[in-house]
């Protein structure tokens, strides 16, 4: 093996298959771009993003780990969210939960 060498799997990988999804319209009402990472608790994102935060509680973006979605100023787009997995405890972010969901 060579350091950094990759051994990709054959075929197509399907992410988060079978997970419940929530679709929300999100608008960036601010004057700067906002970027949200794959595992960020979506309900606690930048206040310039306008959407139903109650529906996003306990959810994250349905995108590949380590990637992000960027919202340009004035942009409106639909996002697909999935429930945060594991023990469903959230700490940090904007400190709006700080414990179990």
UniProtKB/Swiss-Prot annotation:
One of its GO terms (cellular component) is urease complex. The keyword Membrane does not apply. It is found in: Cytoplasm. It comes from the Bacteria. It catalyses: urea + 2 H2O + H(+) = hydrogencarbonate + 2 NH4(+). GO terms for molecular function: urease activity. Pfam families: Urease_beta (PF00699). Gene3D superfamilies: Urease, beta subunit. GO terms for biological process: urea catabolic process. The keyword Hydrolase applies. InterPro entries: Urease_beta-like (IPR002019), Urease_betasu_sf (IPR036461), Urease_subunit (IPR050069). Its EC number is 3.5.1.5. Keywords: Cytoplasm, Hydrolase. Transmembrane segments: none annotated. Pathway: Nitrogen metabolism; urea degradation; CO(2) and NH(3) from urea (urease route): step 1/1. Belongs to the urease beta subunit family. Heterotrimer of UreA (gamma), UreB (beta) and UreC (alpha) subunits. Three heterotrimers associate to form the active enzyme. HAMAP family: Urease_beta (MF_01954). PANTHER family: UREASE. This is Urease subunit beta. It comes from Ruegeria pomeroyi (strain ATCC 700808 / DSM 15171 / DSS-3) (Silicibacter pomeroyi). The gene is ureB.
